[in-house]
């Protein structure tokens, strides 16, 4: 009985919440192929892993990612895996 009353009272609110959550962009890993291309560049430039703007554009085109994703990947990669010599 209580469950029924609560559902009746809040069903509109619950369905609007459900809709809002389904709109949220799902976060996840970048596609494997894109990660492999970025890692390949990383390995070739490990001593100074800072791509130029031109290189970032080329990487974005090669991977199908946008430049913000490229920038974020390099920021995270340097933070997690780079030890400047």
From Swiss-Prot:
One of its GO terms (molecular function) is DNA-binding transcription factor activity, RNA polymerase II-specific. Keywords: DNA-binding, Homeobox, Nucleus. Strongly expressed in ear inflorescence primordia and shoot meristem. Weakly expressed in embryos. Absent from leaves. The keyword Nucleus applies. PROSITE patterns: ELK (PS51213), HOMEOBOX_1 (PS00027), HOMEOBOX_2 (PS50071). The keyword Disulfide bond does not apply. Pfam families: ELK (PF03789), Homeobox_KN (PF05920). It is found in: Nucleus. Residues 1-21 form the ELK domain. CDD domains: homeodomain. GO terms for cellular component: nucleus. Residues 22-85 bind DNA. Belongs to the TALE/KNOX homeobox family. PANTHER family: HOMEOBOX PROTEIN TRANSCRIPTION FACTORS (PTHR11850). Probably binds to the DNA sequence 5'-TGAC-3'. This is Homeobox protein knotted-1-like 4.
């Amino acid at each position: 009985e209580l469950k029924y009353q609560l559902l009746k009272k809040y069903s509109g609110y619950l369905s609007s919440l459900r809709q809002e959550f389904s709109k949220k962009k799902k976060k996840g890993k970048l596609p494997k192929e894109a990660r492999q291309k970025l890692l390949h560049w990383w390995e070739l430039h490990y001593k100074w892993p800072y791509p130029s703007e031109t290189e970032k554009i080329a990487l974005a085109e090669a991977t199908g990612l946008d430049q913000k994703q490229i920038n974020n990947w390099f920021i995270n990669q340097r933070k997690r895996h780079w030890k400047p010599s």
